[in-house]
Structure formats: C-alpha cells, structure tokens
C-alpha cells in the first residue's frame, strides 16, 4: 500500500470512529474509555498450569484443591494466568485472586460438584437480601484486577438443584412443594441454597470474556456491590436437560460502571437483569445500580430481554440499553417491583432494539407475583422453626410509603416489535404512577393493544401500533397519556362467535353422561373441563353432579404471569369425599347434588342443604383441603 492510500485509510477510519463516537452517549464513551484501555485488568505474563499442581481432567476426581493451589500460587507470585489442559474438571468453590486471570480455554470444562459441602457459606446477597449462603462455583470476592476468560465452559451441573427446588417434573415436589403447602413459598428460593456458577462480589476492575456457562443452579452471572466490571461475549445455556428455576442470565446488583455486551442468553428467567436490593433489607443497604450499559446482546428463551427489578430498593439510575435482539423471549423490556420494595428508578434509556415473537414487548408490573413478594410467616409455624432469614424477609417497611417504587424519566426509541400478543402493559400505584415515559420511533405489531393502570405523562412521537383489534390502549386511572398511531391489521380475522353463557357452557359439558365435576371460574365466565387453562379468580364454583368417583385438573397462573400450575379436583368414596389440591388460595363454593341431607360436613367453613333442590351448598376458603360428607 502506498503512502497516499495508507493516509486515506487512516483518515477514513478516523472519520468513521469520530462519527461513531459523536453518536454515543457520554456514559458509553466513558465506559469504553475504561474498558477498552490496554491497562484495564492487566495481568502479568507469568503462566501457571493446573496440571502442575495435581489437577486431573477426568470429570470424576475432585480438583478443587489443586486448582485453588494454582490460583494461590499465581497470586503469591504477584499475578499471572492460570491455564488448563483440555478436559473436564470436577470442582467445588474456587476463589480467583487479585491480578490473576483464570483462562478456561477451548475444550476445558469446569463442572460444579453436586455437594453443598464443597461450597463454604459466605456473607453475600441472595435475591436482594444479605445473608450467609453457599459460595459460587467461581468467585471473585473483595478482589481487584481479575480476568476470567477463554472459550471453555463453566458447567453449573444444575439439575441436582433444580430437582431439589421443585421436583422432576417441575412442580411435582421438592422444597417448593413442601414450602407452598406451609404457606411460605416466598422462602424456598433462599432455603434451597442452589449454587451459582459465577459471582463477583465487592470487587473492581474485572473482565469476564468469551466463556460459556450452562445449567446454572440459580442466577448464572451475578455482579454485586462491584465497580468497573466488563462482561463481553459470554454465552449462557441453562435449558439443557430441563428448565432451571430462577436461572437468570446476567444480573447486575447494586453495582456501578458496568458494561455488558455481545452476550447470548438462553435461560429460564430474566435474560439480562438489573437489581438493587429487596424490601426492608434492601432499603437498609441503600446501594443503587448506576452507570450501566447493556448492549449488542441476543436473548432466546427466558422471561425478560432486559428486566429492571424486582429488587429495586436501592434505586437505579443512568442506565442505557441498546442493540439488543429478542428471539422468542416471552417478555421484552420488563419492569417488576412490589409495594414493599421501594426505590427510585430514573434516567433510563432503551434504544435500537428488535423483538420478534415476544408475547409482551413492554411489560411494567409493579405489583409483581404477590405470593413471592409479600412475605408473611404463618401463625401455625412454631417459633423454633422460624429462621433468622425469614425474619429479615418478613420485616415490615416503615413507613409504608417508603415501600412504593417509583419509575420515571425513561426513554424508549427506535424499537421494532413483530408478532407480539399484547403491545403495552403497565400497572403501578396511585401514590406513584409510572410517569414521564417518552416513546419515539417505535413500531409494534400485536394482537392486542394493551392496558395501562396508574400511569401519567407518557409522550409518543412517531409510534405506530398495528393492532389486531384496532382499539386504543386501555387506560385506567391514568393522566396525560398520548396514544400511539393505531392501524388495525388487515390480516383476515376469524369469524367472531357469540360467547356462550355460563349456563350454556355447563349444559354443553353436562351432555356428557360421564361428567361428575364441573369447576366454574366466574371471573372468566368459564366452565372448565379437564386440562383447561383459566385466569386467576378469587372465587371458584364447583358443581358435583353425581355420587360417583371422578377427578379432573385445570390450570391457573402461578402469580408471575408465565408459569401455570394445576388445580386438582377429586370426588371419591361415592361422592362423600371432595378434595382440592392447589397452590393459590380461593373462596370455593360447592354445589353438590345429594338426595339426603348429611349429618355434618367436616372441613367446611359453612354449609346448608336445600330440600327442594336436593342440593348442598358448601363454602370453603383455602388452597388444598378435604371435605368429608357424613
């Protein structure tokens, strides 16, 4: 290349870089200046091979001690790179020290041993609450200048912890089943003590680059109370051999100056997430998540392309999210919190985002999952069985107003959504609506327009909603909300059928001579047959038509909006025993055809017999119970 061409090439590159830089925000430029510097997390050249310290890559021999000796030797020498010959290394908790690079090269697998005794209990934060908990597989604890790199794999080996949590298949047992029966579903995530693959805690100047994490027992990559962390090119694959509960992808928790980019996430909860503590304990700590950029990532299975919350207590500010692509994630941009979380979430900017086949592209629920979010210790649990962490979890927020989260000053621009179910959803509080939300250059294709409750001051500039209904977004207790431009889709709609009345539905089901039980959801105007799915209702009516044995199951939402759980209804003992097995409390009314008035009904809250109709009416409030007709 001659000098003229070389000069021109340099000039073009400089111009391109200059244009690119001008378009970037001040926050992005500042973080790039930190993380793209050659001096960031610079490690000495010395190399330390784990094989020299006795590590065996056979996937059977526990190698924790040998790998840790290698890391410690590197740290004692002033720093260096720890390397692995190809193979699978079975390990417990490892602690990477300052000035050390853990290089997990291609062909290397570090696999978590399925034994909680191999993970020492440390002070940490779990799902927004500070407590002692098992260490992660790979830990950076109170360190600085650390790298974890390479094309290898960190295998959380999580199936053991998934089954411990909710059984196999899911929702068939485990601690989840035991705890929900006791009325403490909210405690199981903490007490199950599922080991995380990677935790960065109270550390600074950390690089996580290019490795794959799979089968996480709990949250996959957790960055807590840390500063200047760069996550680049990390792949997460948690839906291998099952579906790990709460297997978030990359979580930034009360940390600052964070850049997450070029990642590819497939998990079974929030794909990319930002958190800041939970409830009274999170408000006590009061550490925000701030100065954070998530960009140029792909998300696949999961429950949130990018989620803010539900742990919002310490607040969040100065966050930019862009260049993301969601492929099949069931929620896109997601806010979640609760009336005991508190926190101010402000100055957030989402832009240049694509979503395809995402059911709920914009889902802002600030009264999220009540069965999990509002922790109350039942009176029937003996005092000696109550754990200290339960007391922390159930501590009241005072004054109560402090627990109301506030989301404000949020901008969403240059976003394209294809094939969604519901375009917009928001639900906040009258005391603090979701307010000052600004939309610009947004295009959404959805079957339904959506609904906003307690929102104010939303502006929409060049926002197009192609809606299957052609209806505006429903507004309830809202002020100063601009509607998008709405175009009804031209796709042919199925011929609208008249909705059957409940009596007609019951009559249709009752034509089947074998039918014994008909549950009815009055809220959804729905008579239920075996296998049906319904929405939640406080009240459920159950008709028992004959004195015969029968059983059926239907499904209702668990509470987070995306998992559905069975409700089992059974009649046995020739109609004398009625059993309900469920996980959510309802007020049940049973109408039981009976030719003779029973002497008593064990388990009922109240009951009466109609001689003319030869029918018993039974009232019972509960989740799982048995009624015995004597």
How would you describe each model-predicted region?
Residues 359-361, 421-423, 539, 587-589, ...:
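Exposed beta-strand and adjacent loop surfaces of beta-rich binding modules
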Residues 6-15:
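Sec-dependent N-terminal signal peptides
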Residues 619-630:
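Surface-exposed interaction regions enriched in Ser/Thr/Asp/Glu
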């Amino acid at each position: 290349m001659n000098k003229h061409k070389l000069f021109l090439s340099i000039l073009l590159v400089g111009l391109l870089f200059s244009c690119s830089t001008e378009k970037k925000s001040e926050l992005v430029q500042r973080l790039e200046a930190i993380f793209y510097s050659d001096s960031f997390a610079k490690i000495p050249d010395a190399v330390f091979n784990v094989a020299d310290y006795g590590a065996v890559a056979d996937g059977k021999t526990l190698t924790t001690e040998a790998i840790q000796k290698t890391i410690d030797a590197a740290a004692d020498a002033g720093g260096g790179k720890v390397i692995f010959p190809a193979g699978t290394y079975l390990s417990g908790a490892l602690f990477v020290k300052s000035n050390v690079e853990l290089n997990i090269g291609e062909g290397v697998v570090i696999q978590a041993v399925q034994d909680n005794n191999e993970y020492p209990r440390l002070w940490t934060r779990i799902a927004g609450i500070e407590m002692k908990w098992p260490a992660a597989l790979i830990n950076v604890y109170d360190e600085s200048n650390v790298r974890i790199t390479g094309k290898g794999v960190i295998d959380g080996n999580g199936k053991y912890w998934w089954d411990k949590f909710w059984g196999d298949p899911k929702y068939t047992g485990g601690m989840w089943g035991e705890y929900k029966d006791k009325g403490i579903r909210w405690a199981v995530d903490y007490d199950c003590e599922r080991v995380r693959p990677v935790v960065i805690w109270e550390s600074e100047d950390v690089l996580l680059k290019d490795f794959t994490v799979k089968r996480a027992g709990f949250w996959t990559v957790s960055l807590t109370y840390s500063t200047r962390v760069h996550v680049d090119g990390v792949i997460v694959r948690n839906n291998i051999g099952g579906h790990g509960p709460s297997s978030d992808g990359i979580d930034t928790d009360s940390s600052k100056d964070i850049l997450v980019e070029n990642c590819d996430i497939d998990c079974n909860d929030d794909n990319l997430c930002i958190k800041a503590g939970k409830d009274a304990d999170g408000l006590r700590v009061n550490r925000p998540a701030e100065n954070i950029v998530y960009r140029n990532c792909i998300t696949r299975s999961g429950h949130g392309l990018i989620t803010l919350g539900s742990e919002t207590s310490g607040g969040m500010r100065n966050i930019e999210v862009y260049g993301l692509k969601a492929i099949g994630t069931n929620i896109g941009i997601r806010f979640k919190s609760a009336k005991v979380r508190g926190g101010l979430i402000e100055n957030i900017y989402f832009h240049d985002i694509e979503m395809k086949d995402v059911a709920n592209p914009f889902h802002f629920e600030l009264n999220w999952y009540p069965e999990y979010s509002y922790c109350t210790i039942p009176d029937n649990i003996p005092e000696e069985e109550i754990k200290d962490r339960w007391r922390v979890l159930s501590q009241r927020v005072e004054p109560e107003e402090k627990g109301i989260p506030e989301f404000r000053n949020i901008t969403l621009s240059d976003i394209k959504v294809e094939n969604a179910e519901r375009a917009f959803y928001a639900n906040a509080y009258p005391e603090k609506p979701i307010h000052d939300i600004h939309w610009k250059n947004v295009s959404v294709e959805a079957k339904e327009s959506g609904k906003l409750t307690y929102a104010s001051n939303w502006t929409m500039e060049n926002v197009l909603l192609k809606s299957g209904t052609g209806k505006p977004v429903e507004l309830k207790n809202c002020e100063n909300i601009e509607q998008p431009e709405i175009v009804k889709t031209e796709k042919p709609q199925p011929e609208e059928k008249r909705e059957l009345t409940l009596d007609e539905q019951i009559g249709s089901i009752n034509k089947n001579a074998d039918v014994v039980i008909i549950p009815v959801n009055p809220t959804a105007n729905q008579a239920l047959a075996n296998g049906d799915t319904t929405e939640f209702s406080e009240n459920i009516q159950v008709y028992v038509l004959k004195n015969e044995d029968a059983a059926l199951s239907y499904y209702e939402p668990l509470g987070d909006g995306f998992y559905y759980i069975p409700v089992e209804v059974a009649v046995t003992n020739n109609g004398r025993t009625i059993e309900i097995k469920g996980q959510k409390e309802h007020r049940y009314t049973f109408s039981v055809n009976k030719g003779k008035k029973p002497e008593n009904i064990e388990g009922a809250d109240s009951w009466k017999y109609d001689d003319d109709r030869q029918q018993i009416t039974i009232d019972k409030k509960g989740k799982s119970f048995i009624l015995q007709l004597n």
